[in-house]
């Protein structure tokens, strides 16, 4: 599937009736959810409507890369609006490969797990070259403070809320303000079970708030996961009750 508009993105959800033969998606243009001024934009087609996080058992690959001659460009998703009682993010849950996604100014509120890319994982996943961040100009950060939450849920992570499966993260970062009811992590909110988690050449620069625990890269790990962090760093601010 080729993704060029917000409605194309929404149609990746199983609820749209997307053919089961479609297992891959390629984003080829910037996607803007607010103030587009376009007749076929999200605001015009669905005024006041929030984005429903994508759930699709068959979709296992998403890439945001466009080749321009010998160079490549990575289209951006701007101001993704999510407000859900379940898990929330660009994807409700995901398994497979996410590559080169650019998520700018995402506002995600979830009753369950919340993550910029995925609220939770439902299978082994690789995240490569992805970015979740805020823009000082587009997101009007001069009028906001570190108390303005952009990603919130029972568990919150800059990239992934809850990880219960093997996960590899490479060359990715998150820079936002997160609040977790129990856990909040710059990249991953919570890891559970006996899993292998490998994070390389990645970082988080976030404000993190939680009633339980926070972590610059990983909010909490319960179980006997094998975690490797290589050439990573974290910055920002953390506030937790535990």
Locate each region found by the language model:
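Surface-exposed repetitive/solenoidal architectures
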Residues: 1-242
């Amino acid at each position: 599937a080729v993704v060029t508009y917000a409605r194309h993105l929404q149609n990746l959800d199983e609820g749209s009736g997307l053919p089961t033969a479609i297992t891959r998606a390629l984003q080829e243009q910037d996607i803007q959810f607010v103030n587009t001024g376009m007749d076929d934009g999200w605001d015009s087609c669905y005024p006041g409507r929030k984005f429903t996080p994508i759930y699709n058992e068959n979709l296992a690959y998403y890439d945001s890369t466009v080749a321009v001659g010998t160079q490549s460009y990575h289209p951006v998703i701007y101001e993704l609006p999510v407000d859900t009682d379940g898990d929330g993010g660009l994807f409700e849950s995901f398994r497979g490969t996410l590559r080169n996604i650019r998520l700018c100014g995402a506002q995600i509120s979830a009753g369950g797990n919340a993550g910029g890319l995925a609220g939770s994982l439902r299978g082994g996943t690789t995240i490569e070259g992805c970015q979740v961040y805020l823009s000082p100009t587009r997101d009007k950060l001069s009028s906001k403070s570190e108390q303005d939450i952009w990603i919130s849920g029972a568990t919150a992570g800059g990239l992934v809320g809850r990880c219960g499966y093997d996960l590899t993260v490479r060359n990715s970062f998150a820079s936002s303000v997160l609040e977790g009811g129990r856990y909040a992590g710059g990249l991953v909110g919570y890891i559970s079970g006996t899993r292998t988690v490998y994070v390389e050449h990645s970082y988080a620069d976030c404000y993190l708030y939680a009633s339980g625990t926070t972590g610059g890269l990983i909010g909490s790990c319960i179980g006997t996961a094998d975690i490797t962090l290589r050439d990573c760093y974290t910055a920002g601010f953390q506030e937790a009750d535990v």
